[in-house]
A protein has these predicted regions:
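Start-transfer (signal-anchor) and selected internal transmembrane alpha helices
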Residues: 1-26, 36, 277-298, 366-369
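Membrane-embedded helix bundles of polyisoprenyl
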Residues: 13-17, 104-122, 127-174, 178-215, ...
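Helix-to-loop transition at the C-terminal end of transmembrane segments
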Residues: 18-36, 246-248, 305-318
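Active-site lumenal/periplasmic loops and adjacent helix-entry segments of GT-C-fold
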Residues: 22-123, 127-162, 192
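C-terminal TM-helix exit segments that contain a strictly Trp-centered aromatic cap at the helix terminus
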Residues: 76-80, 236-243, 300-312
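Structural signal for the C-terminal ends of transmembrane alpha-helices
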Residues: 124, 165-175, 210-220, 269-284, ...
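Perimembrane helix-loop-helix junctions
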Residues: 202-290
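Alpha-helical transmembrane segments at the extracellular/periplasmic loop-to-helix junctions
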Residues: 258-277, 294-369
């Protein structure tokens, strides 16, 4: 990252969370994490350290006496360990995991802020990119993800989503010169998919934007889409092999990286390859591109629907209907986008406030207003 803006963004992020620690009196200073999930996550990591059982995700104290296997994956566990292990010379494992987990979320906001400053500079200038960083820091919904004391994987999901979009925005501004950026974006998207299936939305936005760009006439977007899909495919397959033991490579779980997601990225790579081949024809007009795009969509949707029809029910589609109704009504982060549960449309609009302003600004920039 060149320029001073990313470094300033990192400083602003650390200053922001430092002020929260000094003036906000967060519970972590009293030895409390944000919610029960944070404690369960640290228990899971502690069990990994003490047993070394990488593929054993059973939590024996949950749903006793049977125990419970969470839908969580190991990548975030490794990130927390990376922040915790340097503390071991100064405290025991229990305390090191507590403070490593408590600081993981705010520390992961640092690279996210740096990426925003780096990618935004080309579009809104240095000052504008730093203003975007400030807006990123002070939004209540985003702060809730990155707050001190929240040892939760959503902070890593959001940082990886920012990485995907920042890499593709930078590629778009450089007019396709930096061909490695879509490949890196695909790898970041695969890392997000390893962390949680919420990353499917990031993949849809990123891949869909590249496909739409090619459809509307940006010819280098076809190759970029292929590189993105290739990075996504290779990294996702590697993640699947690492996350699951060989006996579970054919397991199908909608809410955790499994065979269904492996098949999905293979189909997406096939569709992207079809677009890339068509993109070599510089004379292909809009009707031809539209036909190819439709064929690519069918190449993904038809086999996926035949092999895994439950995929389209969402990550919680296989949960017992009685449990699903209670779960979706009570856990806001698990709610479907359109079928609101506990959250009202007013609350959803409030959460999207920053996006609405960004859309208005983008339209104004596009039409020179």
């Amino acid at each position: 990252m060149r320029g001073r803006e990313p470094l300033i963004a990192a400083g602003l992020t650390l200053l922001f969370h430092g002020c929260v620690l000094v003036f906000g009196s967060p519970g972590v200073l009293a030895g409390r994490l944000v919610d029960p999930d944070c404690y369960v996550r640290l228990m899971r990591i502690e069990r990994l350290v003490t047993t070394g059982a990488w593929w054993d995700g059973l939590m024996p104290l949950l749903n006793a006496p049977q125990g419970l296997v969470m839908h969580w994956t190991r990548l975030f566990d490794l990130v927390v360990l990376a922040f915790s292990l340097p503390l071991l010379p100064f405290m025991d494992l229990h305390q090191a995991l507590f403070w490593g987990g408590a600081l993981t979320s705010p520390l992961l906001q640092v690279p996210a802020a740096m990426l925003i400053a780096w990618a935004g500079r080309a579009y809104v200038g240095g000052r504008g990119s730093l203003l975007a960083v400030v807006l990123f820091l002070v939004q209540p919904g985003i702060y809730g993800v990155y707050q001190v004391g929240r040892a939760d994987h959503h902070c890593l999901l959001l940082t990886l989503a920012v990485a995907v979009l920042a890499l593709l925005l930078t590629w778009a501004h450089r007019c396709g010169v930096a061909r490695h950026l879509p490949l890196l974006a695909g790898i970041a998207a695969a890392a997000g998919l390893w962390v949680g299936t919420e990353a499917l939305m990031t993949i849809a936005v990123a891949g869909g934007s590249l496909a739409l760009g090619w459809l509307l006439g940006r010819r280098d977007a076809a190759a970029a889409l292929w590189h993105f899909a290739l990075g996504l495919l290779l990294a996702s397959v590697l993640a699947l092999l690492l996350e699951r033991p060989p006996a579970e490579w054919t397991a199908v779980e909608l809410d955790r990286l499994s065979l269904v997601h492996g098949v999905l990225v293979i189909l997406l790579a096939g569709a992207a390859g079809l677009v890339a081949l068509a993109g070599r024809n510089t004379r292909a007009g809009f009707p031809v591109r539209l036909t190819v795009a439709a064929a690519g969509a069918l190449l993904v949707l038809v086999p996926l629907g035949l092999l895994f029809p439950q995929f389209f029910a969402g990550p919680y589609g296989e949960i017992d209907p009685a449990n699903q109704a209670v779960f979706l009504q009570s856990v806001r982060e698990a709610e479907p986008m359109l079928a609101r549960g506990a959250t009202t449309w007013a609350e959803a609009s409030f959460a999207l406030g920053g996006l609405l302003f960004a859309l208005a600004f983008s339209l104004a920039q596009l039409y020179g207003l």
